[in-house]
């Protein structure tokens, strides 16, 4: 059996930067509290916990005011930043620079009187944070079909952003659907490309690899949006696809009769997790 790795996969710049910043802080100043999971990958969260980075799920859990608090790569809204400052906490801001750009565009558009439409999951940490910068003028829309649920009395000036982990073609279809369904109510439309190039590159690489193999294994946390999107991209190519968090989830029957297997990993998936999956596939192929 031939095992092929996607040419672009695993930790993106933003995640790698956030993990390194938290590890460095824990090493230099002692224990650190992360406000929410560092990334949507349980292996990374556990590894950081062992190195002194614990997780508080909300502001209410920040009982110890003596420990530094880390904002995760997903970012937060200005209300959270203000509350951390009010409490006098030392803050380590690991927000991905690409997410910061999205936040600043959300604020700018809202300040200029636009309603801000965000193509993204309203429950995703990044999207919740970006919405916080719109001063109540933002709307998260998870699918193009949900555009019909937008309020009828929206301002005639609309700004459109995307969750950074979405695919470019999906964002393009979303914008097209918005134009088709609301053009008569729009006097001005401003679309800002807030997609992450690293995520897009990984999706392109996954799609290319999916066309060359009989089976795709996508490695990453179940809660990771970009990993789920990778699996969707592979499935769109018609190839048998499985999303696993670890090598322990691999099933021998998946590989029966397969000669070419592809492996990719999401932007929050560490190299060691991908390596373990590849090694386990080799073991299953040899058995």
Predicted segments, located by residue:
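The feature marks the mature, well-folded catalytic cores of soluble enzymes
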Residues: 1-287
């Amino acid at each position: 059996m031939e095992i092929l790795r996607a040419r672009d996969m695993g930790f993106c710049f933003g995640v790698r930067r956030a993990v390194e910043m938290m590890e460095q802080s824990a090493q230099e100043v002692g224990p650190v509290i992360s406000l929410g999971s560092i990334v949507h990958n349980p292996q990374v969260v556990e590894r950081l916990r062992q190195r002194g980075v614990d997780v508080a799920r909300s502001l209410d859990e920040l009982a110890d005011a003596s420990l530094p608090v880390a904002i995760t790569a997903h970012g937060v809204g200005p209300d959270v930043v203000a509350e951390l400052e009010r409490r006098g906490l030392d803050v380590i801001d690991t927000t991905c620079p690409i997410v910061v750009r999205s936040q600043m565009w959300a604020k700018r558009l809202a300040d200029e009187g636009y309603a801000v439409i965000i193509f993204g999951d309203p429950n995703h940490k990044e999207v919740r944070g970006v919405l916080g910068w719109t001063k109540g003028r933002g709307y998260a829309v998870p699918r193009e079909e949900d555009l019909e649920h937008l309020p009828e009395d929206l301002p005639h000036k609309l700004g459109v952003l995307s969750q950074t982990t979405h695919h470019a073609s999906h964002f393009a279809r979303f914008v097209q659907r918005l134009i088709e369904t609301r053009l008569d109510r729009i006097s001005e439309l401003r679309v800002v490309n807030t997609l992450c190039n690293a995520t897009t590159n990984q999706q392109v690489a996954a799609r290319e690899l999916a066309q060359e193999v009989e089976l795709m294994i996508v490695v990453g946390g179940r809660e990771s949006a970009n990993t789920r999107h990778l699996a969707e991209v592979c499935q769109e190519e018609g190839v048998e696809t499985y999303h696993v968090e670890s090598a322990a989830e691999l099933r021998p029957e998946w590989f029966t009769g397969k000669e070419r297997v592809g492996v990719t990993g999401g932007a929050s998936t560490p190299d060691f997790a991908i390596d373990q999956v590849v090694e386990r596939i080799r073991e299953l192929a040899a058995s």
